[in-house]
Amino acid sequence: MPQNSAIYAVSRIRSRERSLIDRETVKRMSEGTAEEAWRMLTEMGYGAKPDAEYMDSEALIESELERTNALIKEVTTDERLTDIFFLGADATNLKLFLKRRLIGADAGGIYAHGGLYESKELMRMVQAKAYKPLPEKMAAAMDRAEAEIAAGRIDPARISTIIDQGYIDHALASGNAFVTAYFKATCDFDNLIAMARMKALGADEKRLETLLLTGGVIDPKAIVKAYQSHMGEGYAKGLPAGEMKAELQKALEEYAQSGDAAALERARDNALMRLASRGKNDIDTIAPVIGFLLAKRQEAKVVRLIMTALRNRLGADVIAERMRMLYGE
């Protein structure tokens, strides 16, 4: 249950921040064996799951994320804002269940945990094509997606974009400065990633237009124009002013060197983490609470990467390279 004291919320978060796995521990885990890394995780209480099956690191990760989600829901002073960051999992699952309905079989994809809705409830919505229980803007987006399908325009990428747009519209409507900055940056980075992916596929600008989000600092029309001019070298310098301009410029420069959309994805994840950490020392806002949630999610990615690599007996140099790919720095 949410409570009213920001100071209490921040103090609880501060006490848990000490348990975040630091880079030195990550380094030691990656340099040992899978068994040694497992022992380190269990000894530090990661996942708090003493009955976990030996070497079932995924169970530890899910347990740790569940504990984190429970803490956030307990200490938040504004459930409306923290819920936005849980809704991302629901948006992912809506895409998955809709795809499964259209294909009529298991369409693949990994079910996302930690949303606000039970998976069965989301599945019922998709089967019934009735989305009223969702937040208004997400429900409207699902209705638009259903209209596309009903008209025979079954384009998975476009439908995914429509659902993402509904989620972003819901977040931007919060009116909170931190949440707005976070999702504006998400929108801009995701649009640049879409541009890079379409370039790799040799798609035309009409195709790109259908996959761009609105709500960021960069006008989608400017992205299409840059795409038409083959993303000239001057594009990064011509980005509109905004608090993420330097981050976006750096990401585009890295992409220009590698030609790999993954460079933009890494830049996005790192930029969003830095944005989230800006309010780490606040004592009267929701920023430290959300920042901790995002840090724990990043930590889970690191643990998963290391344990998977060690189980597959990959060398330390390979793990180090994959860590660089994850962090991008």
Model-derived features: where do they sit?
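N-terminal domain-start signal
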Residues: 1-329
